[in-house]
Amino acid sequence: MSNIQHAVCHLQRGSGNDSGMSCHIERKTADGKVYIPDNANKARTHLNRELITFPDGVRSRTEAVQYRIDNAGLHRKVGKNQTKAIRIILTGSHEQMMKIEQSGKLDKWTDANLKWLRDTFGEDNVVSCVLHMDEKTPHLHATVVPIVTGERKRKSREGEKKYRTQTGPRLSADDVMGRGRLSTYQNTYAEAMREFGLQRGVVGSTAKHQSNGEFYRQQMLQYENDIARLNAEVEKANEG
């Protein structure tokens, strides 16, 4: 068994403004009721914390996503089905994360994560970053609004007229989630985590690090359960 301690950086597109995930991440429902998932230790939930200071008037992760979009100076209307938020899980192998916490370096670790997020995606685009301490392994749930600048990249078609495109801010998850960029994120994140004893997995390897893979599966299962429960509550309210 390998003793290598891996850095974990997992990106996923949210659905719309990703409000369904806010329940799990913020430990509360849209109407403010406390929600503790089955895999969380409610005795430790008070240790969870939001690391980003929201703008005045913004009270939640979901509102922070919309605030960024409304104030980004976008030239084009945001499509109904466009991805407005990218969710990012940041952590490391359980054994090393426990060492980081027990050695009093967790705050330094969170600071390094925030720096990497802001350097990588732009400070204004990092609208939320919640530290979870009530599950098995300490981890961060970061939320990035994929606003980019520069001309939109697309292949020209033969015979197609060329139009001048605006180069201002635009919402584009495709730009942020391109395959080449995803590989770069893994490299730069591992470099930022090196001082904490965490390193990147083997580039190009088809093998999955078991503990990391299990972590992802547990997270996705919990998300699905949260969404199903919230949908049931909405249907019940509509029936009433």
How would you describe each model-predicted region?
Residues 1-240:
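N-terminal nicking endonuclease/strand-transfer module with a His-rich metal-binding environment
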